[in-house]
């Protein structure tokens, strides 16, 4: 019989010594909620929440328990599951050596904004709150990749700028601003805003977007945030696929834990964070976090990760779905596709990356290939493909733009872009339809349909693409040819043209 995950059954779960299940040994009632986290999904629960749990478990940290926040109606599911389990959940780590289970207790509460927006603002403004961390995906920042400015005309931002809506914000920035106003009125320091999203210069972008928002509301608040605020840049890494029913069943059968929403992940985890906190921080360095003083160090790690790991994910997600693959490890098991990924990293991306003292890029690439090949975590292509309009401009297009600038090789990267332009139509090479999960889906599909096998229509979206792409003849020729070949022959029949020794 599986034990329902709860405080009541925690000792029973931990007593299964033959399973070596780690459970919280600290008193979860004897903590303060010093971190408010917006966007509690799989990645947060496998990353920041695990680091905090380790600090509480092994180093006696008690002032940085987490209060989760859900801003969207869809977050009601997470609220309900966590509440039913006393806000605990299980992390399942999978590798070739087998699976381990770890009950995480660092999340102590969860606030659902659609039910009570005031409670969220009050929690962020509370003196005990030192950090508000974010995993809100790229689209949640309302950041124009082309102009590097806030999308101030977006209806959600316009809603939050309206003084009549000051007490009922919709966006993360609306909540952050409202809470910052209260802290200033109370004579408190601003909390640190800690982005944990996959974006180059994520802290700087967060700072600039919040300050831009504040300037439109009250310029004096923008000045206060600029003077006293903390927005660390950070590089985060841990592959975390969507939880499936078989995952839940395995946890119940193998570990005797009845958990409605566990997290499945890999053993590897990494976090490099700039030491730029406004109101104190936990001793993250005690649990393996690389805390660095120089923002350039973070940016270099981040650039390596986004351009190699995340770009490779894109190179598997968009061509892979068109070709009918379902999982990352399936792509890596295909000899031709595996060569394509390796050659893209080595010949097109690696030459554009800065050297980091003590980091062997070839070894890093080999580690990525091993991680991608892990069949036990069953990482789904739809997961790594979602929100493509936020990912491709971050992960792939910058390498293409830099290759244009230095007249470097970019054919494989362009092939990935061509596949993305086909992917947004939601039809694979065999005519099977699939869902395109993207906040810009309608615009992307409209442009892709209008353009056919030509890229000009989709490249006209100025929030995603700059003139450096639209005006480069070499890029336009390569991407047009790739789009025509893919439309006529399919992804896998076209790919050999982009692989040496295919």
Curated annotation (Swiss-Prot):
NAD(+) binds at residues 35-46. Belongs to the mannitol dehydrogenase family. This is Mannitol 2-dehydrogenase. The keyword Oxidoreductase applies. Its EC number is 1.1.1.67. GO terms for molecular function: mannitol 2-dehydrogenase activity; mannitol dehydrogenase activity. It catalyses: D-mannitol + NAD(+) = D-fructose + NADH + H(+).
